[in-house]
Each structure stands twice: as structure tokens, then as C-alpha cells.
Amino acid sequence: MFQLTRRSTIPKMRKWTALLGLLLLVQPLFAQKDKREPLTEPEIEQIREAGIVPSQRIDLYTKFLNEHADTIKSLTARKKTDARAQHLDNELQDFTALMDELGSNLDTYSDRHADIRKALKPLSESTDRWLSILRALIGEPSFDLARKEAIESGEDLADQAKRLLTEQTEYFILHKDEAYQERAEPKSKPDDK
């Protein structure tokens, strides 16, 4: 009788082990699916193509952020539903991720002394518009955290853009020979002979 029970238990354990193994293999696929990408593939390709031209890259990020801001604004006028709240939460998270990514790019371009003044002016104007849209959005429990993070990120980006515009204006007054360059080129030193 012991063997009969043991024989019937082993196949059941194998089935459970196989099921558990399958679940462990499938779980990472669901985790990857949940990771949101704030840009579409064509937008990512445009960013890549503009990769070596800082002002174009900033202009593209500004354009894509304007599109997200318009989407957020259009969602605020819709009837309050769970689907709307989820869509707003996703858009706000994407918006924040893009602003943070743009901020990182600005840091890099600033360190290189790339002349990005032309792109900073429209960015600075846009950040004011984005913040007014975000502040006008009445928070709901399902997306209030994302809204607050977007406002904080927007304020940081607005401050950064204005500060960089001032710094760059002052820098290029002193370094006129470097103005309008995508990155500061090292100056050649005369050979000491």
C-alpha cells in the first residue's frame, strides 16, 4: 500500500515541479512587458540620428515632451474613469522619464561646452507651459504620486534650462571663438621650442 501511494505522489510532484519551473521561466517575460518606454521606435530612431548634434537632440526631446503634455491636457477634460486615471498615470510617468532623460543630456552638453543656447530658449518656454498643465491637473489617488513627481521633475528641468541659458550666454561672451560649436574643441598650444 505504501508503494501505491508513493507511485501516485511522484507523478503529481513532477507535475507541480514542472509547473513551478514553467512559471519561473514565464515570470521575467511579464516583467519585461510591464517596463514602459516613453518613446516610440521612430522617435528613438530620430534621437539616435540627432545624437551627435546636441541642439537637434534637445529640440526633439522638447517636441516629444510637448506631445506628451498635449496628451495629458486632453485627458484632463475627459470623464473620470479608471481607464483615464491609468492612462494619465502612464503618461505622467513617461513625461517624467523624458524630462529626466533630457536633464541628463543637458548636463552632458553643458560639461562639453556645446553651444545649445538656440535650443534652450524654446525649451525654457515649453517648461513653463508643461508646469501649468501639470499644476492644473487635479490629483486623484491613482495618479497623484506620478503627478507630483512630474511637477518636481518639470521644476528641476525649468531651473536647469534657465540656469544653463544664463551660464552659456556668459560663457560664450568670454569665449566667442567657441560659440555655435556643438562641443568645445581643444585649443592647440604653440610648441615651446
What does each model-found stretch correspond to?
Residues 1-13:
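N-terminal secretory signal peptides that target proteins for export/translocation
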Residues 7-8, 20, 41:
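Helix-centric, low-specificity signal for extended rod-like, repetitive segments
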Residues 8-9, 16-17, 185:
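Small/flexible residues
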Residues 10-11, 18-19, 151:
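General helical structural elements
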Residues 14-18, 120-121:
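Short, surface-exposed loop and linker segments with low hydrophobicity and enrichment for Pro/Ser/Thr
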Residues 17-28:
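Bacterial N-terminal signal peptides
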Residues 32-193:
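Long, charged/polar, soluble alpha-helical segments
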